[in-house]
């Protein structure tokens, strides 16, 4: 019986190595082709790919698959800048006549090309160094930065509609995103794969919840949390945020433990897609246009703060950013800002005259 079991395990291993879905090192030996480098990047235990969050890996996999399936057979040493431009144009082509160009698709592919070539450079592959030098001198049109944001008036309308729909959790979630200027992930958390037998915390069907706001983040009226992306600790005095405080005070005292935002149906933190689904349902009931997404609450927070005259560095710290340029990327230029600039310019002319 032991012999049979060992033989079964051996055959199982051979099957997995042969399988197209396996990422074992044996299947991912670098042979100079782009495909082999893509697969090595995904399989190598020392690859930076291993440090990515699961959701980011999924995004990367999309672009990597485009390269693997469409230009993977190309020898990296033979790829020129002209080839890369041609690939970009091909990836950008509409899916069907009359449909828009797929700029996001093309940009994702080129971004992943940069990633894997930089990985190859870290392995001191000369062909990757040459192609990397060429790529560093090339620019490609990406998706335009979002210009939408959520306003305070829309948040108020959303809160009202959420309570009418029996979803106080959604009223709380969006209010916290807007008032605190936090990423959605830092408010509602995210569910990460965790199949370990001794998984701790909140676990559901092989997924473990992490990174969301809990009551342990609040001491008195001060909310303090380390953000998931930058690791920067942000602090907010809820006494200065009446909307957020009002929503929190709706929570019964006996429920004030664990995650702040819980799905009324499951009693667990929201899955991302369920949260965004309910956001759209309630947003439509509140008269908020479909082009406004829940993630735009963060841009709304930054824009409102800068419009109100807050110092950019203060806004940067409140949003948990480590660079001012990141904060500026969330700022949606408004008429108030351009009017303020015009007033200052006109006033300066009077002083000169």
Model-derived segments and their meaning:
Residues 1-5, 30-64:
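Short, aromatic/basic-rich helix-turn unit that serves as a nucleic-acid recognition element
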Residues 164-167, 254-260, 265-268, 276-317, ...:
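Short, basic (Lys/Arg/His-rich) helix/loop patches that form interaction surfaces
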Residues 193-202, 217, 290, 310-330:
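Short, polar N-cap/turn motifs at the start of nucleic acid-interacting alpha helices
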Residues 99-103, 107-111, 122, 130-189:
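Basic, Lys/Arg- and aromatic-enriched nucleic-acid-binding interface segment
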Residues 22-36, 54-55, 68-90, 146, ...:
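A Lys/Arg-rich helix-loop hairpin that forms a DNA/phosphate-binding surface
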Residues 77, 126-129, 139-160, 215, ...:
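DNA breakage-rejoining catalytic core of tyrosine-based enzymes
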